[in-house]
Amino acid sequence: TSGHLIRPNKTNRHIGPSLHINTYNYPGKARNYPHMIQPDYIFECSWEVCNKVGGIYTVLSTKARTLQQRFTDTIIFIGPDRGKPDADFREDPALYADWAKAAASEGLSVRKGRWQIPGTPPVILVDYQPFFEKKNEVYYEMWESFGVDSSKAYGDYDESCIFAYATGKTIESFYRFHGLEQKKIIAYFNEWMLGFGELYLQKYVPQIATVFTTHATSIGRSIAGNGKPLYGCMNGYDGNRMARELNMEAKHSVEKQAARYADCFTTVSDITATECRQLLDRAPDIVTPNGFEPDFVPVADAYPARRTEARKKLLRVAETLCGRTIDEDAFLIS
């Protein structure tokens, strides 16, 4: 994304200094917008910050250098503290040291440092484990305030949502400690896993502009993963009904409400915009295609060497797992 805040679907709402919102329709894709506001701080939050799980890690890590060049340490990534060493994270005790002490007095445990990716942006890792003892209170609050139904939660739902809740509290703490009330702030939340963080800020710090991005809807993934035709029968699907059928009610609920309440709801392609409109009952305000640095893809002359290097690494991993030597010309499927 460009780092500018687009404020659609709000009429005559004033949030913070000089943030006046006007209404205009979903355009289908990024074009020219009359209301582009340069933020003073951006908090980008994801389960995959310093946590290489899937494709969102690539999306975030490959845009960080450009964002860091543009915003120079006022773009702050927030991810989970998983309680173990991480090669992607280099701790810096001096970074935000005074705030971290204040946060600790509020019951927030964080580690601060630099994400070891191009641009080395500042990063805050949040210890969310202490909030598990308040899980039922958190779920009740989200039900009462936003209609999020966590009653049928299972799997990774608890861990993701409690981390997201802790992320919202962390942003609030940073915001109040540094007196950012007169600044233009964006909190950017990726995927349903961070929905509770967005909703927390909507309730307690509505001055902070929230962006919620889905890279693909949870129920859409489940439909496709269960062998059902997703795009061929898109117009016939009801998101709530499919969530009940596929036992996805909790994840679908938080994702749908996060999309509903976000100041700006985005997705990454026109086809996922159609998916959101049909399954989440809200069309994205803007489509923000994923972008990569120009040097992300090796130049043609470098391909053979990079391929050979990658193949050797795969063979070493395979040999370690199998406990035997594997021929160099083995056929690898990955």
Where are these predicted regions, by residue range?
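Short hydrophobic targeting helices and cationic amphipathic motifs
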Residues: 5, 19, 26-27
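Alpha-helix boundary/capping motif
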Residues: 10-12
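Composition-driven detection of intrinsically disordered, low-complexity segments
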Residues: 14-15, 34
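Aromatic (phenylalanine/tyrosine) cluster motif
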Residues: 24-26, 33
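Catalytic cores of nucleotide-sugar-dependent glycosyltransferases that transfer UDP/GDP/TDP-activated
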Residues: 33-334
